[in-house]
């Protein structure tokens, strides 16, 4: 399945990706996975970065109130954590395309600016971003508090990348969500002891324990992470 996604991306430039291409890359691909907790939230297709959850709260509360009055189903209590390799070019391309798709008219200047973001040099770092989607906005508060209250020091020993041989690479820097729509960011050194921490033959696990109740655990196979003939992670 991942190979089909990569092939579809290779066949057309990122500026021509569909919404389906974007969502697949960000949420169900070699570079982006979804960890779900709670009830079935499969019917939701709108992913909200953790920075966007609070902004939606007021309008969703009003909508939910109207739904309750009309006898329609109440929100399902689920959380989806979208864990992505932001340092991988296809993920940045998907975020860039998401921005363009939100525009009514093509914007050449914005496209050029976004291309610069896609081509940014990540040769020294591995960056994992985590976006959040909730089925019930009442759940947003504690989640926001966990991400916004964390810092590099508190997460230094509870966030790491782990290779298939058991070797761990602990967090270098944490950045809480800001208004860029990409969520929280976990930054790691790409090189350890003079060698890249990961190679094409590796499997890697991302683990982040933010508090007693919130733990992220996502696994990736690097041999699937080829984009335009290059290993992207």
Where do the model's predicted regions map?
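Sec/Tat signal peptide C-region and signal peptidase I cleavage site
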Residues: 2-8
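PEST-like low-complexity, intrinsically disordered acidic/proline/serine-rich tracts
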Residues: 9-233
């Amino acid at each position: 399945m991942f190979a089909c996604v990569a092939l579809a991306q290779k066949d057309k430039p990122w500026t021509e990706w569909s919404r389906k291409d974007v969502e697949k890359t960000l949420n169900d691909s070699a570079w982006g996975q979804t960890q779900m907790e709670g009830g079935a939230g499969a019917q939701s297709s709108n992913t909200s970065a953790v920075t966007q959850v609070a902004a939606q709260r007021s309008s969703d509360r009003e909508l939910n109130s109207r739904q309750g009055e009309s006898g329609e189903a109440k929100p399902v209590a689920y959380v989806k954590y979208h864990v992505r390799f932001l340092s991988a070019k296809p993920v940045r391309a998907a975020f860039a395309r998401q921005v363009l798709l939100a525009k009514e008219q093509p914007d050449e200047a914005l496209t050029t600016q976004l291309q610069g973001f896609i081509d940014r040099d990540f040769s020294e770092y591995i960056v994992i971003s985590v976006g959040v989607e909730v089925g019930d906005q009442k759940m947003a508060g504690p989640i926001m508090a966990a991400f916004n209250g964390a810092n590099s020091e508190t997460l230094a020993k509870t966030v790491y990348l782990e290779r298939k041989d058991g070797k761990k690479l602990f967090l270098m820097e944490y950045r809480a969500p800001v208004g860029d729509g990409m969520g929280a960011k976990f930054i790691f050194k790409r090189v350890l002891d003079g060698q890249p921490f990961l190679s094409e033959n590796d499997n890697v696990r991302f683990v982040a324990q933010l508090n007693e109740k919130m733990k992220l655990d996502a696994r990736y196979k690097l041999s699937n992470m080829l984009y335009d003939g290059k290993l992207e992670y």
